[in-house]
Structures are given as C-alpha cells and as structure tokens.
Design a protein with these regions (language model features):
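Acidic-and-aromatic substrate-binding clefts and catalytic sites of carbohydrate-active enzymes
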Residues: 61-70, 91-98, 124-126, 162, ...
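Beta/alpha (TIM)-barrel catalytic core signal, keyed to glycine-rich beta->alpha loops juxtaposed to Asp/Glu
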Residues: 3, 40, 121-287
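Active-site mouth loops of central-metabolism enzymes
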Residues: 23-41, 87-97, 224-234
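Short, acidic/polar
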Residues: 33-50, 95-110, 160-169, 236-243
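Active-site groove signature of glycoside hydrolases
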Residues: 106-129
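N-terminal binding-site loop/beta-alpha segment at the start of enzyme catalytic domains
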Residues: 1-84
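Acidic (Asp/Glu)-rich catalytic clusters
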Residues: 8-10, 52, 74-82, 103-112, ...
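Conserved, mostly hydrophobic/aromatic
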Residues: 6, 18, 50, 58, ...
C-alpha cells in the first residue's frame, strides 16, 4: 500500500480509503440490510481485512443509515484505533447541532477523538454557505469541537465545484476537501488549464479526498449499453480507479467496501500501476 500526505494535516493516509456509505445504507449498491447480525459480522471482517492490508483511512457519516454506518465501523475498529484515521461528518444549522452530532458520533464510533470532521454538503447554495459561516453557525461548532480536542482537523465535502463551494474553500478554515472526482466527473481537476477546485485546494495545502472514484458503476453500465465489446475487453474497475489515482494532487480515493473480497479487489486495482496515466500528457493530446 502506498501512502500520501493529507495536505497540511501532515497525516500519511493510504491512497485507498474505506468508504462507509455502503455499510450503513440499506440496499445501496446492491442488496444489503445494515441492521442484520450478518451485516455487523461482515463489516467487522471487512474492516479488519482493510487494516491488515494497509488501509488506514476510514470515512463514514451520521447520514449513512441514521448512524448505523458509524456504529458498524466502530465495531470493526475495536482494539484497532491507533492504526487508523477516522473521518466522519456533520450537518446542521448551528453550533449546538454540530456539538450534538459530534458527541453522538464519538459514542457510535467508540472513540474519544475524531481525526477529521467534515461538513457534509452536496451542491452548495447561498443559504448553505450562510448557515455554515455565520456567527454561531456550523463552522463555529466545528472549530469549538476542534479547540476542545474532540476532533483534530476540519474539512467539507461537495458533490461538485460551484461558486459557493469555492467560498467555503476561500475561508482557509478547512484542512481537507472531499469532492466527487472520476473519469466521468473530471472538471474539479483540469490539467489542460491547471484549473479547478482541486488545484485551488492544493494551493492552500489542503488534503484532497476523491469520492466515487469508480463512478459507483455508472461508467461501466454506460459502456455496457453503448459498447459492450469495449466493456468486456478492459477491467474498468481497475481502469477507473487508476485514472483517479493518477492525479498527483490527490491524497486518498475512498471506495465502498462491504466484504473482505472487495477490499482485496480494490487494493489489487490500486497496485496495478500499469494502468496509471500522465493526466497532463493525456489532456495535452486530446483536449
């Protein structure tokens, strides 16, 4: 497993991270019942396999099954806390809501400190930015939790780049950006112009986390519809992950995993360096 620097946090993170959404959400990316005893056993086994294989970055959120995703991850991390980086998230309109969310996450995860607390956003609006940045807003609550030692670093997630996400970035208050970035959704990182929100984050020495690096299967399904012969000719699981890991500004790509076999498959894909590409050269030739 290769490790990369998570921006100015100076934390070394595995270039593949454990994405917790599929663990906590019912029937997300396939049949799954997160409340079952079987789910708990499988997630514990999966988390332990991930740690044994060198994965140290674990991402989850209260919104993944109303806290079930955090609870399952906490079960898997028992006795392993010192080996991992835990990243979870908050929503809420004010500092008090953030505080309540952090306290619940700490309990469910079975830890006394969260390594990275991220505001859980999507496509930001002016209203979203206001409730985060206003006095007594969500950011104030996140900073208070950090100052108290309940969390170590702050970040925010975004489905995509827009002017409002850039406003959050421009505050300089966040250490890490998590953004959707993959072979379909490339515009957060444009090597042809050296532009995009990933470049902006790197200019602040922020860590950059890619969500949905393998497009949640969308790219593969599209290929199956329009060019099935191409879909069958290439291991697109490996190819899509390799595309994202080729980004030199990326810290970690998080992939959902619910079985030890999925852990092994994701690590094998990451280790296949023959599929890595020079993104600058790629865009110079074809853009």
């Amino acid at each position: 497993m290769d490790y990369r620097r998570l921006g100015r946090t100076d934390v070394q993170v595995s270039e593949i991270g454990f994405g917790g959404a599929p663990a906590g959400l019912r029937n997300y990316l396939g049949a799954w019942e997160p409340e079952s005893d079987d789910a708990a056993e499988r997630i514990v086994q999966t988390v332990r396999r991930a740690i044994a294989r060198g994965i140290n970055y674990f991402d989850t959120a209260p919104g993944y099954g109303g806290g079930r995703g955090e609870e399952l991850l906490g079960l898997g991390l028992r006795g392993q806390r010192e080996k991992v980086i835990i990243a979870t998230k908050v929503t809420g309109d004010d500092a008090d809501a953030v505080r309540r969310s952090v306290e619940r996450s700490l309990t469910l995860l079975g830890t006394d400190t969260i390594d990275l607390l991220q505001y859980h956003g999507g496509w930001y609006s002016a209203e979203d930015v206001d409730k985060i940045l206003r006095p007594g807003g969500a950011l104030a609550g996140m900073q208070a939790a950090r100052d108290e030692g309940l969390v170590r670093h702050l970040g925010f997630t975004a489905e995509g780049p827009n002017g409002f996400a850039s406003q959050l970035l421009a505050t300089g208050a966040f250490d890490v950006l998590q953004i959707c970035h993959n072979v379909i959704f490339q515009h957060p990182y444009d090597p042809s112009r050296h532009a995009g929100i990933i470049y902006d984050a790197a200019a602040q020495d922020m860590g950059v986390v890619a969500m949905r690096p393998m497009t949640s299967g969308t790219f593969q399904r599209w290929l199956g519809m329009v060019a099935p012969q191409v879909q069958e000719a290439v291991d697109w699981h490996r190819a899509t992950l390799a595309f994202v890991l080729s980004n030199p500004l990326l810290s970690v790509a998080i992939a959902g995993m619910r079985t030890p076999e999925e852990v092994d498959a994701n690590i094998a894909a990451a280790e296949d360096r023959l599929m890595r590409v020079d993104l600058d050269l790629l865009h110079t030739r074809y853009v």
